[in-house]
Amino acid sequence: MDQPRRWAVEVVPGADRDRLCPLPRHDVVPSRSIPPTALAIAQAIRRVRTSARCGAAEHRDLFADPAWDMLLDLYVAEATGRRVSVSDACIAAAVPQATALRWLNMLDQRGLVIRTADQTDRRRWWMTLSDAGVALVERMLPPTMT
């Protein structure tokens, strides 16, 4: 049986409200082998995009693509063994839920994500990147040094 999830409140300066964020779990196993350098780059990009949305208003449009936010979140989640529900993916997009769901449908239609029904809760669906989704994110990351 899964251990209960621990949560912390993340205070985001300039945001309309604080967010509940899951604390890292050390008992999870990554579902895909992602190079550590690529993971570090993806995590850094995600942090920059999150903080930039809260920053200067004149530059917010540079960080406004919800599809990229969802793809990055799913990429990092797979590398760290974290499961992502549809609701989690919508939160990662930082847009209204209806907008995020439209983007998820588009990503699904393009074969970049895979939706899997939760075996214990028929209301919940899990999201993962398809092989094509992983390849797209890795193509978009800056070249890594080995």
Walk through the language-model features, giving the residues of each.
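DNA-contacting interfaces and partner/effector-binding or oligomerization modules
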Residues: 1-32
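Short alpha-helical segments that sit at the start of domains
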Residues: 42-72
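Short amphipathic alpha-helical elements of helix-turn-helix/winged-helix folds
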Residues: 73-77
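Short acidic, hydrophobic short linear motifs in intrinsically disordered regions
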Residues: 80-92
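Short, cationic-aromatic polyanion-contact patches
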Residues: 118-139
